[in-house]
């Protein structure tokens, strides 16, 4: 059998196993119901006889069961197979978001017509909600045609995209909170069902993930694991599944050949980065390398969703610099739009480049780099700003040997992110400000998102040291209810307040957050006086392993081809 035939066979096996597990879930629900009904009755596994029974079973793990059941039944399912019902749920959610976008446009456009700030929020919201549906469509497109021959990776991909959809929708709501408009509540109501449906979809997929662990599926289908290991082996050290174009790029010794060159002095094809980006082929599926020569490039750069597999290579993080000064407080720009550089196209890589926002602490929210792309890698980059410097908005991201500097919430967002061997630099804030390194934005307890600092160095710039006892610095604070941040193997200088973490507002999220420090060192790592919130965790070595790049990002599958230093686990 050829490779294509083998892959099809594997896919059929995987689909069959997932369906079988979901049927087991339905049976379990039926058994539980039977047990609760009568202890004297003989327990008999129930059959899926009606659409109602099947829908109720699939909706069992969700938080919004009534919304789940009503939406699926209204869609008149023609199948009682659990997998088909979950796919139907994705379609229903997409239609719900699209209908809500239209409703918001009809009902709120007139109300926002005389308010530039609110009108801008409404326009941005429409874009974000369309991005949310794109992630849901990714789930549908990959449901039958997934290519990674491991069930766990397939399920995790779905969780990543569902988490991304949730992040986009939450960002829409956050955008309205930045205005003084009363329309924020209207937006919450209009998109209430859509957001509940997305959460329900994540709950269903997460339940599959849990079942895989409980039933030890990788052990049952061990040939899949063996097949995956085969895919990752090759004599030249490059995974065998990497395509010929990428292989040639990776195998090149003495540097990478650029597709285009950007230079201020006219020695390249283009003088601006945005001009070079316009040369990226449509539906690009192979590395497109843009070499950006030494210089300061004052431009707002947007790598759009259509610009995939783009690589930026500079002459050094302090030699090639992209700069801007858009900000929320002085410039009246929405936080999401303040980014000097916005990365939206998947499979993006940046090496040896600096990104900065020069608005200063007076500008308040002023993003230097926003990353919404999936499978993004940054190596030897410098990201400088003050408040909200690095916006790790959504999806999988890996930073290695980078420097990030700032004051308030300067690494924030809801991506699945690992910063490895990075320097985290606290800067001097305004007189009345404290400094918080992280503000992770996980808003649903099942999201696969979180922020991990591994083998990093947390320090302060020289100007901060004299004011550290006045303008105290903290490891982070919970931006959203299920905020998750893990700091491990990191050297923490004497710049962090002994309490370690700071509340966001009163007791918000203190019970539901997930914060952990594991095997850190340095004078700021002493946990004796740390806050004692219920959400603070003490990790075992096994638990800590979950947050290494190999596990948390499934990084072994996609980071090594970028040829950057990479440590999958602890060594």
Curated annotation (Swiss-Prot):
Lineage, highest ranks first: Eukaryota, Viridiplantae, Streptophyta, Embryophyta, Tracheophyta
Keyword line: Aspartyl esterase, Cell wall, Cell wall biogenesis/degradation, Disulfide bond, Glycoprotein, Hydrolase, Secreted, Signal
Glycosylation site list: 36, 91, 207, 216, 347
Sites annotated Transition state stabilizer: 387
E.C. designation(s): 3.1.1.11
SMART domains, per database record: PMEI
Record family assignment: In the N-terminal section; belongs to the PMEI family.
Keyword Cell division included in the entry's annotation: no
Subcellular location, record wording: Secreted, Cell wall
Active site: 388 (proton donor), 409 (nucleophile)
Alphabetical GO biological process terms: cell wall modification; mucilage metabolic process involved in seed coat development; mucilage pectin biosynthetic process; pectin catabolic process
Record function comment: Acts in the modification of cell walls via demethylesterification of cell wall pectin.
Protein name per UniProt: Probable pectinesterase/pectinesterase inhibitor 58
Note: The PMEI region may act as an autoinhibitory domain and prevent untimely PME activity during transport.
Gene name in the database record: PME58
Enzyme class label: hydrolase
